[in-house]
């Protein structure tokens, strides 16, 4: 029997197996298996956002639109599971009210052919940029009228959501923030408040105007890699050099913790951010295309 149903916590091991087998056949460029499997945490935290495909009692595929993912086990492809999962993804995206469905699709091969046949359209790409180890980045300096401090988990959650919502309101790809998601991130065992930096008005530590989060990977990674995960500045405080200084803080932070390489991802349509990162010495190393499908109709 071939069927679809909502994801449950009990499906996590089977979905991980699908992730592993799909990754072995060809995962996203410059993404490690450990990073790919990190999607399990989000699935377990939000099972209502995902669906699985079944053959009999076996999970052979899954989709998690919030993470732009749809994967089918390589041995069970070309049996209609992808098409059914795409329908489920479309319904999940419509229910979430987040606009058109977006999925990561490889640049070529059967994944792209599937997307085209399903009526999806290429929208844009995220570029993975990497800072070469030999590149010298200046130390961050203060911006006039602005001070910085670490985040206070619990105490800053609502203010950070408001800041990020306003800072990314004009972002080319919709970004959604909530107090619940922020609290979940802060509750993870690997969360360190020192990895996040809040920029605020110098005379008011509660008036937040910018944000940066930068982390390092597992100590077992060789070489140890840093990741500037997010840089955001309120529109009214842009063009003062604050984004550049927050970026430089992130680079300095992960290098102080031993990172040899520093990565960040940027939406190709975010031209001003892309210019900044390239000017600071980052170079493109991978492309992650995103394709869309309207959820209405």
Regions found by a protein language model. Give the residues of each.
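Short amphipathic alpha-helix that is part of the acyltransferase structural core
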Residues: 1-38, 52, 141-175
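Active-site rim helix/loop that mediates acceptor-substrate recognition in acyltransferases
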Residues: 19-62, 172-201, 208
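Conserved acetyl-CoA-binding loop-helix of GNAT-fold acetyltransferases
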Residues: 78-92, 230-235, 239-256, 274-279
């Amino acid at each position: 029997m071939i069927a679809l149903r909502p994801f449950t916590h009990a499906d996590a091991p089977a979905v991980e197996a699908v992730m592993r087998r799909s990754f072995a056949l060809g995962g996203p460029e410059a993404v490690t298996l450990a990073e790919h499997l990190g999607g399990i945490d989000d699935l377990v935290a939000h099972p209502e956002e995902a669906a699985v495909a079944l053959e009999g009692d076996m999970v052979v595929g899954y989709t998690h639109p919030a993470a732009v993912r749809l994967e089918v086990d390589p041995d069970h492809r070309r049996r209609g599971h992808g098409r059914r999962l795409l329908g489920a993804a479309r319904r999940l995206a419509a229910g979430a009210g987040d606009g058109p469905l977006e999925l990561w699709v490889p640049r070529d091969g059967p994944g792209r052919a599937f997307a085209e046949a399903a009526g999806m359209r290429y929208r844009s790409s995220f570029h993975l940029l990497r800072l070469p180890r030999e590149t010298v980045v200046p130390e961050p300096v203060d911006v006039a009228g602005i001070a910085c401090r670490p985040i206070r988990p619990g105490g800053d959650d609502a203010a950070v959501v408001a800041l990020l919502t306003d800072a990314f309101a004009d972002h080319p790809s919709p970004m959604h923030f909530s107090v619940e998601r922020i609290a979940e991130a802060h509750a993870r065992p690997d969360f360190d408040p020192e990895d996040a930096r809040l920029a605020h008005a110098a005379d008011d530590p509660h008036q937040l105007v910018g944000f940066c989060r930068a982390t390092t990977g597992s100590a077992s990674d060789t070489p140890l890699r840093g990741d500037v995960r997010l840089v955001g500045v309120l529109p009214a405080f842009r063009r003062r050099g604050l984004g550049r200084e927050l970026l430089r803080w992130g680079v300095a932070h992960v290098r102080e913790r031993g990172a040899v390489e520093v990565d960040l991802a940027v939406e190709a349509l975010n031209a001003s951010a892309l210019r900044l990162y390239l000017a600071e010495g980052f170079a493109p190393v991978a492309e992650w295309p995103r394709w869309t499908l309207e959820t209405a109709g």
